[in-house]
Amino acid sequence: MAKKKSEEHSGADANDSDYQEEPNFEDPPGFVDNISDEDLLGDMLAQRPSEADGVESVVVVDNIPKVEPERLDKLKLVINKLFSNYGDIVNVVYPVDEDGKTKGYAFMEYKQASQAEEAVKKLNNHRLDKNHTFAVNLFTDFQKYENIPEKWEPPTVQTFKVQSDLYNFINDPDTYDQYCVAAETAPNCVQVGFWQNVLPEPFELETRERFTDTFVKWSPLGTYVVTFHKPGVAIWGGSSFQKIQKFPHPGTQFVEFSPCENYLVTYGPTPTGQKIIIWDIRTGAEKRSFVADGMSVLSMFRWSHDDKFVARMGENSIHIYETPSFFLLDLKSIKIPGIRGFSWSPTDNVIAYWVEEQNQIPARVTLMEIPKKREIRNKNLFHVADCKLHWQKSGDYLCVKVDRYSKLKKDKKDLDVKFLGMFYNFEIFHMREKEIPVDSVEIRELILAFAWEPIGNKFSIIHGEQNSSNVSFYEVNKGVKPSLVKRLEKKSCTHLFWSPRGQFIVMANLTMGTFEFVDSTNDYIISASPDHFRASEVEWDPTGRYVVTGVSSWKVKEDTGFNMYTFQGRIIKRTILKNFVQFLWRPRPPTLLGEEKQKEIKKNLKKYYAAFEQKDRLRLTRASKELLEKRSQLRETFMEYRNKRIAEWADQKSRRIMLRGHVDTDNLETDEVDEEIVEFLVKEEVTLLE
């Protein structure tokens, strides 16, 4: 109880009016407080030590093999190697029975609790072998499960969100294609516009400000468009491009869709290398993640055409994972000593890989059938410096470009290998023929580019000197060696772009911005040779009707924009866009019509010509009428503005006269103006005539 001042200062004046007795804060006798300590001091009580303190960094591993004492050391080595990838392990306990045999579980203590949480996240449900799959939990989880309430409460019902039609873009009756145009409006701020390529002028579908930080990318079938942000990436779709799913992966620099759009792979840097995460697109769940040592090459994963398998190359091996479990195929990698590269067939579950020369053993190209892992074709190659694998889009052919040498020189000091007398071979595998025969084409000049015709049996190459190269076209037929059908000499092109439908090809020089359009069925005649200075990209639309060339601000800062051409090279649209960075046609899914139905339509195509031509005429007439109406409206708007300004100018006449010394300068006669011509000598030259 607080003491009174009168007691503390006995000599004080009791009648002092400024003196007041201090309040008494003690509870009266028998008082019962109805406020609990948790309500009153909850924030402080939350910090008090608990029984779980000290075990937050302990994990419990169930379903480990039960082994005898003589095999325990080997088991510890395997499990410790696996769990030490996620932190420093300070203590491990393997309980054993009376006979010294392990009981099938173990306790592991990490140095930090965060390391234990990461181990649980990554190794729970990890499959050690066909009989043992880990169940990994934090030690503190047992307390959580003990405190489960006895009375069950049903979960809250979440309202169903109706998702818009993701495939409405292919329902257009006139089958107009869509495209997106990206322009950087500020650092890390890119505006993206979506357009429909309607004739005679494209129609704007949607424009999004600050849609992405860097660039956008379409999914293989055109269902989604992906955007990049600091926290991760997001995919959008539907008629108004709504957000469908987001994937948290900070610093993502590159993404890759599986061919059937079931999975998304994100690549992002870490302080020690690069982290790769595979996501389920529909659920947004993380299926599996990998940490690569060093900055690995982007797109290190290769998908099978049907999304059933995904593969990556390791040291002297290929790792093939099955979906949707993402476990290794048959729980083990395929050992291939000396492997240097591999690629999936675009239409079949067949992997092509090549092995370098080793100890007098020749290099080898192998075709392997998955999941049987059966080698269906081998081809030995000698004096090989490098190989590149090129599949034709239809999967009918595989071309292996082989860089060969005549002489090998090794430097004893730095162990560098120099290849002398280089020449090149094209090994053509006929995938649809019995026993897969292989043809060879030898080229003695430097190969600058190679491209298959997507639908057809031709391929083209650029060879020779860079400033004056030749373009050769070869045709591949059953039972005969590939034949040279045309050579275009002295062409300064650097890239080849076939139409998605075949037949037409663009030979491009992306250094100078020059292009040549070639028809491969009409004696390879060059139909047009347009220029687009500093153009750095070429994009065919999915139907092969239009080609776009673009000048990106990633390369230059002035005159950025894009041009649109017909497949014959006729310019139909020029667009100058400040800070233009990207143009992408929206891909189309494959047709649902069978081959017989497609053949029937092609056979009877002439029947539809009249209807198509009439529709085109009506469209052009409607467009002309709309253009005239638009011009008339613009003229009326201008005349209205002009008359308004004339009236305003007339109202200000008195003010002008006053400012100009009471002289009406509006009606001065031109006769009062004197015109004087003055001539003067500028230069004098003297010429002597002999």
From Swiss-Prot:
Q: Where is this region: Disordered?
A: 1-36
Compositional bias (Basic and acidic residues) at which positions?
1-11
Q: Name one GO biological process term.
A: formation of cytoplasmic translation initiation complex
Q: Name one Pfam family in it.
A: RRM_1
Task: Map the WD repeats onto residue numbers.
Answer: 207-246, 293-331, 334-369, 442-484, 530-575
- Record keywords, A-Z: Coiled coil, Cytoplasm, Initiation factor, Protein biosynthesis, Repeat, RNA-binding, WD repeat
Which InterPro entries would you find in this protein's record? EIF3B, eIF3B_RRM, Nucleotide-bd_a/b_plait_sf, RBD_domain_sf, RRM_dom, TIF_beta_prop-like, WD40/YVTN_repeat-like_dom_sf
Locate the transmembrane regions by residue number.
Answer: none
The answer to whether UniProt assigns keyword Secreted to this entry is no
Extract the coiled-coil ranges from the record: 595-645
Name-wise, this protein is Eukaryotic translation initiation factor 3 subunit B
**Highest taxon of source:** Eukaryota
- Where does this protein have compositionally biased stretches of type Acidic residues? 15-25
Q: Any idea where the RRM domain is?
A: 57-141
Task: Enumerate the GO terms in the molecular function aspect.
Answer: RNA binding; translation initiation factor activity; translation initiation factor binding
Q: How does it assemble?
A: Component of the eukaryotic translation initiation factor 3 (eIF-3) complex. The eIF-3 complex interacts with pix. Interacts with mxt.
Is Protein biosynthesis there in the keyword field?
yes
Where does it reside?
Answer: Cytoplasm
Instruction: Please describe what this protein does.
Output: RNA-binding component of the eukaryotic translation initiation factor 3 (eIF-3) complex, which is involved in protein synthesis of a specialized repertoire of mRNAs and, together with other initiation factors, stimulates binding of mRNA and methionyl-tRNAi to the 40S ribosome. The eIF-3 complex specifically targets and initiates translation of a subset of mRNAs involved in cell proliferation.
